[in-house]
Amino acid sequence: MAFQDNSLFPHYNVLENIKFGAERNKKKKGIEINDLIKFLHIDHVIDKFPHQISSGEAQRASLARSLLSNPDLLLLDEPLSNIDQSFKEEIQVKLKQILTEQKITTIIVTHDSYEAFYLGTKCGIILDGQLKQYDDPYNVYHFPNSIEVVNFLNRGILIPAKV
């Protein structure tokens, strides 16, 4: 699990926090720790403690810890919300690759519709505690089933009408 608040252990440095994930699932072969550290652009902070790094770096360290555990099911709550735009897209591409290659079933909670549509194979729109639409991302985006979903996606829709 990776949460928006990062949930890093304050008494561990970044590297120790990430390695904690590896201890959770030694039986499954997963991604290498050095590859994760490089692709998440946190190699320059591995010796620092959580209070010494930015929120984006902490979020990436938390994501690395979660991925390193190579789980069967992964819950991500706003996993990229604090990440700088300069490498957010690169991380999305690599994250999708890892989740696909490692066959990790992932539930992603996000307000970023691009992120949901890019990373997801299924997409659910929940408004006011109710599931309004659940489908593949293409259908949710191109064929929203209600005005509520259209408004949530922040895009206009042309409706043929006679005046």
Regions found by a protein language model. Give the residues of each.
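Short helical segment in ABC ATPase nucleotide-binding domains corresponding to the A-loop/adjacent helical element
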Residues: 15-23, 30, 47
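Conserved ABC ATPase signature
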Residues: 49-53, 57-59
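Hydrophobic anchor residue at the start of the ABC signature
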Residues: 63
